[in-house]
């Protein structure tokens, strides 16, 4: 006898909390391999520490200890000097999925609200161990410290406090201790060390001390004392909204008229634009927002595309800046030559603002070390965050490799000792997947990546030409210095005269070459 639908649903229908969902789909958090999983953990903890410190006006300082206690089994201790986390928020920060301060339309290193809680979930899934947190905060001018031991209640998507006590702390900040299995530490291009190295190039205002499992201690010193200004929250641009966006705004606004709602919820909207919109659509924008129909919202979106607006405001975009990129590259790579550029803001998909920055470093420790040879490396970033995976599908890789590098004095890009830096800045970086490791090849973004890379490549080409000319001139100078004394001596003998004082003249002829050998390339 066939079973009834109600019986089937009563037995099998379930609801999943976000924690339960990601427990079954941890690959959606980026945890898809031993090396990658550990690198993602480093990424989440470091970016959270940076964001917290910068928002509080503090130069970030982080200490990381990674100890191996078994095969693919590690203890990670991460400590920062940020403002700390108030006691009542600690369980939410570390044990609740989709809880955080990164859900605004603002440029941010993280956007999903999964960072710390995702790391705790991975730790709990692979070891069953709780997370230990020490937080120091300033409350009413008094330094307070609290220590908690927590586990995540996956069913309820919330934290369970196993232990809690007040402790003395040296200053504000957070220290977190996590156990992980099925992860691996590697010095490869995708490993945790390389992630830190690249992070420091894009964040020269930070300092990180890293003690790795092999006993090595790496100190990445601060190259700048300038804290990046905080980006401002920006309103969506009319060219970038959808019918669903408008209906959502209408349901949650406190405005009494749809036109007023548009002016307060969208950038570049004025009374003149509202009047123009009414004329184009024939829709009465004085109606209540909740009375707006889907078909009318679609009409408005189509009308927006026909209207002229100023470009989106760029106050919400904070690039690293040419000087700071240069400082970062020089501190970490110690190159022979650097060039940087920050392009002017552009838009993609009609109304989403973005900025592309590029840098190039040649010689020194530039490039990736393969055996005893240095080869080219493309350092990809989005909002200062290194993208260490999925390079093949990324717009940055495509844009850089699409150049004819022979035109810029690089005959074999793969084997050149150069590091190419590209950072995409936006409130809404178009990632190709939830792993957020590659930028979508939007035509406008791809074009800007090419333009920025060409600018720094031309500067490198100019330097390489000067270097080649200097080398040739130095060789000519050596010939002069070797043969002029002999020629003058023989000429004096033939003429039966004393040798003239030729040294001042010889110095004048060879001075430029000597300067270039001793002091570098000069104009």
Curated annotation (Swiss-Prot):
Keyword DNA-binding: yes
Keywords from the UniProt entry: ATP-binding, DNA-binding, Isomerase, Nucleotide-binding, Topoisomerase
SMART domains: HATPase_c
Classification via InterPro entries: HATPase_C_sf, Ribosomal_Su5_D2-typ_SF, Ribosomal_uS13-like_H2TH, Ribsml_uS5_D2-typ_fold_subgr, TopoVI_B, TopoVI_B_transducer
Enzyme Commission number(s) of this protein: 5.6.2.2
Enzyme class: isomerase
Catalytic activity: ATP-dependent breakage, passage and rejoining of double-stranded DNA
Presence of keyword Ligase: no
Binding site for ATP: 48, 80, 101-102, 110-117, 436
A Pfam family reported for this protein in Swiss-Prot or TrEMBL: HATPase_c
One GO MF term: DNA binding
GO biological process, one term: DNA topological change
HAMAP family (alphabetical): Top6B (MF_00322)
Oligomeric form and interacting partners: Homodimer. Heterotetramer of two Top6A and two Top6B chains.
Biological function: Relaxes both positive and negative superturns and exhibits a strong decatenase activity.
Family: Belongs to the TOP6B family.
Descriptive protein name: Type 2 DNA topoisomerase 6 subunit B
Lineage: Archaea, Methanobacteriati, Methanobacteriota, Methanomada group, Methanobacteria
């Amino acid at each position: 006898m066939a079973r009834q639908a109600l019986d089937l649903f009563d037995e099998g229908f379930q609801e999943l909390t976000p924690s339960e969902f990601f427990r079954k789909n941890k690959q959606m958090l980026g945890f898809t391999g031993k090396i990658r999983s550990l690198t993602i953990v480093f990424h989440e903890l470091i970016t959270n520490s940076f964001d917290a410190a910068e928002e509080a006006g503090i130069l970030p300082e982080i200490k990381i200890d990674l100890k191996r206690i078994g095969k693919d089994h590690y203890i990670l201790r991460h400590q920062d000097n940020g403002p700390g986390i108030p006691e009542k928020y600690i369980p939410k920060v570390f044990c609740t999925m989709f809880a955080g301060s990164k859900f605004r339309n603002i440029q941010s290193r993280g956007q999903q609200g999964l960072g710390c809680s995702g790391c705790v979930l991975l730790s709990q899934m692979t070891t069953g161990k709780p997370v230990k947190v020490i937080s120091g905060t300033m409350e009413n001018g008094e330094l307070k410290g609290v220590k908690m031991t927590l586990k995540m209640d996956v069913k309820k998507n919330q934290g369970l406090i196993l232990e809690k006590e007040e402790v003395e702390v040296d200053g504000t900040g957070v220290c977190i201790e996590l156990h992980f299995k099925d992860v691996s530490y590697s010095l490869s291009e995708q490993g945790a060390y390389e992630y830190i190295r690249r992070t420091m190039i894009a964040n020269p205002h930070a300092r990180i001390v890293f003690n790795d499992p092999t006993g090595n201690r790496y100190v990445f010193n601060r190259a700048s004392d300038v804290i990046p200004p905080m980006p401002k929250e920006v309103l969506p641009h009319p060219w970038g909204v959808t019918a669903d966006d408008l209906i959502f705004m209408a349901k949650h606004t406190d405005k009494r008229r749809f036109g007023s709602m548009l002016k307060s919820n969208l950038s570049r909207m004025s009374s003149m634009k509202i009047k123009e919109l009414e004329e184009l659509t024939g829709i009465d924008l004085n109606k209540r927002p909740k009375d707006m129909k889907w078909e009318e919202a679609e009409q408005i979106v189509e009308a927006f595309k026909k209207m002229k607006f100023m470009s989106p405001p760029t106050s919400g975009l904070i690039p690293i800046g040419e000087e700071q990129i240069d400082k970062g590259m020089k501190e970490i790579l110690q190159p022979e030559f650097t060039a940087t550029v920050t392009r002017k803001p552009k838009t993609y998909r009609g109304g989403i603002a973005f900025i592309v920055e590029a840098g190039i470093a040649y010689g020194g420790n530039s490039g990736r070390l393969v055996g005893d040879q240095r080869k080219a490396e493309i350092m990809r970033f989005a909002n200062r965050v290194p993208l260490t995976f999925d390079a093949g599908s990324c717009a940055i890789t495509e844009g850089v490799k699409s150049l004819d590098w022979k035109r810029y004095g690089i005959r074999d890009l793969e084997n050149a000792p150069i590091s190419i830096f590209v950072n995409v800045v936006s409130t809404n970086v178009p990632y190709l997947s939830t792993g957020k490791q590659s930028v979508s090849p939007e035509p406008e973004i791809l074009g800007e990546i090419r333009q920025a890379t060409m600018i720094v490549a031309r500067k490198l080409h100019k330097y390489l030409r000067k270097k080649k000319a200097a080398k040739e001139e130095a060789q000519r100078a050596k010939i002069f210095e070797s043969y002029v004394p002999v020629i003058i001596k023989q000429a004096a003998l033939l003429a039966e005269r004393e040798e003239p004082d030729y040294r001042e003249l010889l110095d004048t002829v060879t001075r430029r070459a000597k300067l270039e050998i001793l002091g570098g390339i000069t104009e």
